[in-house]
Amino acid sequence: MAPPLSPVSKLLIGLIRGYQLVISPLLGPHCRFRPTCSQYGIEAIRRFGMLKGSWLTLKRVLKCHPLNPGGEDPVPPKNFDNREH
């Protein structure tokens, strides 16, 4: 079971949902990844919390550009550790 969300995490998820409902339909589908970057952000914040979830989301959004082919890029599992040893 996921830990309870902090108020800031809920706010960030609300902002992403607002983007999904208001801005994204105006821009049309252009995300190169599955799940979309906005859905990835919601999942990452829910899974890892505000700090790490936001960091993963930022890295994902920066990869979403015309030179990247995109494709499947799910949120890493909870035990994911990207630190280099």
From Swiss-Prot:
Which UniProt keywords are present, listed alphabetically? Cell inner membrane, Cell membrane, Membrane
Compartment annotation: Cell inner membrane
Q: What is its main location?
A: membrane
Pfam (any one): YidD
Record's bilayer topology term: Peripheral membrane protein
Keyword Hydrolase carried by entry: no
Spell out the family assignment given in the record's similarity comment: Belongs to the UPF0161 family.
UniProt function note: Could be involved in insertion of integral membrane proteins into the membrane.
Q: What is this protein called?
A: Putative membrane protein insertion efficiency factor
